[in-house]
Structures are given as C-alpha cells and as structure tokens.
C-alpha cells in the first residue's frame, strides 16, 4: 500500500546531507493531487504576524534547515543520484537510536566562549590563562616546588641497620615479600614478652620475614619497640610504617631453642625437621653438660639460659642484647640489700626483703612536696598506663613477712630515685603470707600509691609529690633553720649550742642578716595586724561597707523607678461583658481541670504573657495561669493586671499544688486584637531586669540592716572598753582597800563579820516592827512565784548562806550595789544561784553608801539571769494528749536521737534551733547507753533545752517548747476555748514569743522611715 508524502517515515539523517534529500524515484508524481498541493501551499504561507517568513514545505526540510543553522555542513557528491549501501542502511535504519560518541561531540572551551567582537587593538581581550596574576601564581608555584625538592634532597636520612647490612636488591625483595604477608603477629598490652619472642622464632622456621602489628603501649614509642625487637630476637627491622614492622631473621639464622635434657634421641626419633636436628650442635651439648655437672663455678654463676614457652624443658641461650637488659635491671638493685637466691623466675635476682632490718631507728616517712597546679591523685588513664608498664617489669624485691617492713621501705625509697615503680614478689611456700597486709604496711611507711596487688605481686608507684633524699633533706634543713630564726626573732632569745651546730658556718652571716630582716618584717606585720584587728579599724571598714551598700541600694531603686515609669498598666474596663454565677461556677470547674496552663515566672506580667493568653484563646475559651506568689492577695493583684491588659473576664483565683491558679475567660464577644503584645507593659528583657533589681534591693536592705547593727555593736563595745579601762584603774585602789580591810579583820573580826552580814540579817533574825511595812511592799513580788520556784530558792539560799560566811566582803558589797541598780522589777524574776532568795528583798532597799558596779559586771549578771530565767511548769493530761496527737501527725520529722555516749550537748543545740521554727520535737532514745534510764535522758534534755515533756513512748519522747501550738490546739477545744495555761509564753519558753513580722523586716522599715 502506498502512503501519501506526509505519511512517509523520515530517515535517520547523518551529520552531512547530500545535495538532494529526497530522490525523484521516492515520490511519485501521480499521487500528489492538486488539492493537497493547494492545501500544502496554503499551509506554507501561514506564519505568525511578527515573522512573516515562508516556512519549509515539510518537517524534514525544517529539521535540515535547523541542523544547517547549528553548523552541520552538507557533503557534495559528483553523482546526482547515490544508492544507499547495506552498511549505511544498517547504520541509519529506521527506529535505531543515535548515540553520539565523545569524538563526535564538539569541544567548546570556556575561554573560547567569550565574544571577541568588542575586542579592539588598544584594549584586546586577553587569552585564558595569560593574565599577570595567574602567570605570577604559576611562576611562584614552580619556584616553591623546586625549593621543596632541593630541601628534600638535602635532608640525608640516617640509614638503618638493615640498609647498611643488606644489599638494596635483597632489601627490596624482602620488603615485597613481607608486605604481601597476610598473617601478622600482634604485640599487646604486656609488650615484648617471651611468648612473643617464641612466636617470632616459630614463624622464622618457615618464613624469613615476620609481619608484626603493635598495639597499646608498644605503638606509643615505635623507635623503642624497634630496638627491643632487634635486641631480644636478633633479627633486623627491614621496614617500619606506623605501627607495622617487618622483621627479618637474618642470613645465617639458626633456631635457638633446644631441650635441656641429656637424652636427645627421643627428639631425633620424633620426626622433627632437619633444621631442628641440626640446631643442637656439639657446642651446645658441651654447654649443657657443663651446666649440669657439679662444679664450684656453676654454684656461683647461673647459666644464662632463658626458658621458652610451651614446654618446661625448652630453653635457649640469652642473646647479648638480653644480657645487657638484665645487667641494667641488676644495676638498679645494687646496694639495696642481699639477694634472694631461691628465685624461681628470670634474672636478675631480687632483693630479699626478709633479710632487711625489721625496725630502723628514728625512721620517718619521706618528705613530700607536690608541685604547684598538679593534682595529687592519678587519673584513670594514668593509672591504667602505669599498671600496664609494671606488668613486664622484673621483680625488685621478694617478701615473705607481713609486718615490720621499715628496712624494706628504706630500700624502696632508694629504688624510687632510679625507677618510678617498685615491684615486690610474694614468696612461694611461706606460710601466713597476706599481700593485703604487706601492701597497706608499705603504703603507710613509704607514702606511695598502690598500683596493683594480687597473691603474687605488689606494685607501688612513688607518686607525683616524691622528692629524692638529697632534695628533701635540703628543704627540711632550710625549713628548720627558718623556724629557729623565727623563734629567736620573736622571743628575743639567743640560739642554743645545738642550734648553732645545725647552721653551716659558711652561710652563718647570711642567715643572721636574713633573720634580722625577717624580724623587722614580722614586727611590721604584727603591727599592721593589730591595727587591722583594732575596733576602730573594723568600725571604719564596716562604715565603708555600709556607704557602698547604701550607694548600690540607691542605684537599684533608681533603675526600678525608671522601669516603673516605662510601664503604664491599663485600667479595667467598666462597661465589659458579665457572666452569671452559674456560668462562673462551670467555667471555674472546667478551668481547674484543664491540663494546658501558662507558668508565670520571676519576670511577672509582661507583654509576652498577654500574647500567650491570646494564643491560648485562639483554640480554647479559658486560659489557666499558674503563679508562685506568697499570698492570695498578691495573686489577686496579678489577676487584676492580667484581666485589665488582656480584656478578658476573671473567673477565679484558686490555690493549687503548684501555686495559685488564675482562670481568665475570653468572653462571648471576643475579637483577637491586631497587636497581641500591649505597648503599655515591659518587654521580656526589661521584666527580667526589673526582677533582678528588685531582688538586689531586697538583699541590700538586709545587708544595710546587718551592717548598721554591727556598727552599733562596735560603738557599744568601744564604750564598754573605755569604761573597763577606767574601772581597771580604779581597781588598783580598791585592792589596797581590800588589803587594809583584811588586816582589820585580824584585829577586829567581830566588826568585820557584822559588815559582811549587813545585807543578810533577815536570814538570821526575825524582822522587827519597823521592817513590816517593807515586807508588805515586797510581798506582791514574791506571791507570783510557784511552789517549785520557792523550793528552788530555799535550796539556793541554804547553799548561798553557807558560802556567805566564807566569802569576801567586797563581793557582797558589789552584789548589793548591782541589785540596787537593777530595781525591784528585775529582782522579782531574777534567780541567781550565788545569792539567797531573801537577798532580792534586801537588794530593793536603798542602802546608804551603795555604789553602782561596772557595766561589764552588770552585763555578765544579766546573761546569767537570761540563762536561769523562766522556770517551767507541768502540762495537764488533756494538753499532753492534744500535743501528742499533733506531734504524731507531723509529716516531716527531723531525725533527733540520743547516742551511745549519752552526750546531749549537740542534740540540745540542734533542738534549740529546731524550736525556733517548730513547737514540737520527737527524740529517739532507743540508742542510749546500756544501763541509762529514759528519765535520766529526759532530765538532761529538759535541763539543756528548757522544753516540756509531752509524752514518753517506748522508744521516743515528745518535747514541747512551751508556745506556738495555740492555733493548732483551737481545733481540739470546743468553742475555740484554749486554756490560759497554754498561752503563757513568758513562763514556759526559753525563747521570746516570735512576732508575726520578722525582726529584720521591722528593722528595715525603721531604717527606711528614719525612726
């Protein structure tokens, strides 16, 4: 079937086109109708209004025209007609995808894409890479490369032992063989042990090169590992890179191990290799025979054999390098003591610790001094590293006893001057050896650090603060000289003969000059310290602190005032939406159950708080805000501010476990404002600044109050010191008067007795009629005292009357003058054990010639008055029951207990501090000493604390301070009728009734108001 022209499939075009794309035989003229041509011609002239170009007649022609515009050139052939061969038809067959090769794609460099049409001779476009900067860069780079190569050539690498002994070709061959090896030998934490050496020799029996991989401590110093491998094995390191080593066995290598038994026929018959059979030569047999034969030299010199691994009879001769290592280890032990001859391990022989002296006269622990900035303890990494270093070390000492190791301690300290670690082996076969006791004894005697300990070995580290004996002795000598010169300069004494002998003669004059300068320095230092510690200096310093605190407080108040001026909170809207009580009840109930809430922190209310409220109101009608205020009134103030600024309706302010919950309703006609953050409130940063400044002002107020109290106390102390100095000068004259009175007492004892007993005549005789009125006046002061207090005073009066006849007249005169000054009010409540009860009555009388005592005596007597003031009474059974219930309901009980020693001084001090905040205390008496009754412990506690016994349980007692439980006890009494006996803080407490407002706050208010 023939298709029209526009239905024919186009051919795959090559890059070049012939002159005529469509041969005349492909398109028959009979099939082209005029109708189609006219339609085609009409389609040809259709074009856009802007172009007005004549389009090609077909799509193929348009594609060809596009390819010509892209740079493809047509190939011109001589023959007008060309037949397509089979190859070309195969290449350009219909349906084949044309994939261009890289050679067929045009290469466009970046430099050649620049349009050169605007280039002129005066301003030519530079070629890519021909600029001055890039040319200079390439030139400098070439110079740098040449210099680097020259330096590399100048550095002559030191050749290794393998490079010096082996030819280069053989060395390259061995390195190639070693690098291709897949099996490798790992050197672990223990280092190059005999097992590693044995493994290397076993591999050398089959291969001439062994690849070794170092780990842990061995890789930290590869040069050291390199040398140790060559020393212990006798091989050559032919290549080393990182932690890998290629070890060559050598040219004339022989397997070094042999069996120490004389009968070698069994080994020969066991089918060993020829190499193994040729190892044991005549020289080795002779050495074995000589070592086994008994001789004097063999007893003195041990054969240099090293036991192998895997068989007890397998040994080898030590290499020269190994002998050198043993000699170095043996050199460390020279001069430390006798050797342990029955040593079972490798050389060198350790020192026998049992042969060292058990007790060294005048032994002292070594002096230590830690460098500045160094931590005394070892870190975990340091401990691990030192422990790993101590494992391959040879043993320095062998020990079999547990105690009396002073001689061994001296030897260890000497060893520490050469080696940081000391390794002690525990002797085998010795009875009752305990490595733990040994380690503790040595650690205490030497002051070192225990690194590791087991049943066989003990490793001790000398520590970071270790000093050699020469350095420590020099430091101790210098300190001793300094102490001697300080003592001589302070006390002004001359040095003794022994101390003179201590000082070296060469530096005697220098020490004297230094001592003189030090004496002057000490005197000036003492003078300055006295001036600093004087009350005047302390008062001046405190005044300066007070002025600085006041200045800081003023600055804080100024900043707070500025922040308050910036904030202008809005007033609540008068005409706002209201809600009914039922709605408020339901909203409150829903709000308290809400899980999402806003937390109000230390910043308080600021613009971000209101923004968060509006964001909450976007999804819910209520918002719950938690604030940590101290009172419900403060929470209500915060709620009012939130209500006014947000425009919501305050529902409730309730107390919850986290603080106070403020619930705000957005309202039924809520509209979200355009600006969520109100401009009348502070920002987040300003709110934090306000909180910090308020806290600073509060702390400065208390600091100012404390400093002002200190200044008042210092002023009072200065006045008392001046008064004491005056009374001290008057005391000398009074002592003269006392001496005269004592002389008169010898001559006129009866008159002196009458003068002494002037104030106590009421105790010995019945009062006369002239004294009845005075007794009636004083009767009102004696009546309030209870019966127990009267008995106490009678006992005291008896003891005082017995001392009165033996006392001095001056003491009685001073006591009378003191009581004359204090007055009757203080005398009624003052119970001094040094005076009888009736002396208070006589003290109220105005005695002629009575002089007032000094201020220090009055203050001392007042302190004794405060100690003995307030004799407590017992509680009723009902009060005890109520207080017991209240004590047992306490949730947080402080752990008070009486110990085995029955000393209650510290417990009483703690109870007094506890009673300042809590009215009740529970004391556990179960742990008291055996044979001590509970009543005795209770009596001690009551005497020390002044508390009341509420209840005595089987293992505990309940104490009451005497006041503070009235509010709680009201719930137990009907009609809130609390007995008057509970409300007697003046007679039942050893501490004043605490006010509702703290004293510090009251003093701060007084200071602020200028009162």
Swiss-Prot record:
Query: Which residues form the organelle targeting sequence per the record?
Result: 1-45
Where does the record place the region Disordered? 77-96, 721-810, 841-872
Q: Which UniProt keywords apply?
A: Chloroplast, mRNA processing, mRNA splicing, Plastid, Repeat, Ribonucleoprotein, RNA-binding, Transit peptide
Which InterPro entries does the protein's record reference?
CRS1/CFM2/CFM3 (IPR045278), RNA-binding_CRM (IPR001890), YhbY-like_sf (IPR035920)
Listed Pfam families = CRS1_YhbY (PF01985)
UniProt keyword annotation of Zinc present: no
Q: Where is the CRM domain?
A: 164-260, 376-473, 577-677, 873-972
Where is composition skewed (Acidic residues) in this entry? Answer: 772-782
Question: What GO terms describe the biological role, i.e. biological process, of this protein?
Answer: Group I intron splicing; Group II intron splicing; mRNA processing
Entry GO CC:
chloroplast; chloroplast stroma; plastid stroma; ribonucleoprotein complex
Instruction: Locate the compositionally biased regions of type Polar residues.
Output: 722-736, 762-771, 849-859
Question: What is the annotated localization of this protein?
Answer: Plastid, Chloroplast stroma
Q: Gene deleted: what happens? A: Albino seeds that germinate poorly and die soon after germination.
Q: Which is an annotated GO molecular function term of this record? A: mRNA binding
Q: Where is the composition biased (Basic and acidic residues)?
A: 77-90, 743-757
Q: How does it assemble?
A: Interacts with RNA. Part of large ribonucleo-protein particles that contain CAF1 and/or CAF2.
Tell me, in a sentence or two, what this protein's role is: Binds specific group II introns in chloroplasts and facilitates their splicing. Acts on both subgroup IIA and subgroup IIB introns. The substrates of the subgroup IIB also require the CRM domain proteins CAF1 or CAF2, with a simultaneous binding of CFM2 and CAF1 or CAF2. Can bind to and promote the splicing of the single group I intron in chloroplast tRNA transcript of trnL-UAA gene.
Protein name, UniProt field: CRM-domain containing factor CFM2, chloroplastic
The record lists the organism as: Arabidopsis thaliana (Mouse-ear cress)
